[in-house]
Amino acid sequence: GDANNTAWRLENMTVMAGGTNAETEREARRFGPYTFKSQDRLVTLEDYIAFGNRFYNSLGSTGKVTAITREGFSSANIIDLFVLEKATDIQLQKASPTYKKDLLNSIDEKKMLTDQVVVNDGLVRTLDLTITLRLDKEYKELEESIKRKVSTQILSFFAVDNMEFDKDFLKVELERKMFQLSEVRFATIDNIPDIVAVDHNEIIQLNNFSLDILYL
């Protein structure tokens, strides 16, 4: 049938952060078992990751942390932490010197004596997305409302609490989330490959997105 196109763009999103000590239910479910298992000592890489992701510094800042053991027999007890500090609910930033210092001091109290911990800057892999929504014509008068709903879904998907180091972006997962809205017939991301792979020290972050509407 005949199609009508409209475009909509949201750039440089800034979202107010939540309470500084408000650990999310998802964080508690994911990292709680590791903390319990470690008996308040940092023994395994999972312990370091759990501790780092639940850590708040002296200024109330939190962030995302991953840990790896440096390769090579002679350095088996060197733990490399990769850290990013939370700027907003959907944005990470390079961790401040204060944040790194506070994290390292807290770790020193709980780590094994034979472990040497090195704090490194994590890397943000930003995405710019061009998205096409296919809607039935009868929804044309509700276009702005639908765009707002879809935008909320997108921002929720990319919330810092949902992102992890070494977690690839799978296009189909976001398309599926947008498709959950009853008004959306189809949703496609048009400008990136099906999988955006990241390294162990990288984390995905949304930079901006545009919504194109195609009426069926």
Predicted segments — roles?
Residues 1-50:
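Catalytic P-loop NTP-binding/switch module of NTPases
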Residues 29, 36, 158, 162, ...:
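Preference for short coil/turn "hinge" residues that link or interrupt alpha-helices
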Residues 39-167, 174:
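Carbohydrate-recognition loop of C-type lectin domains
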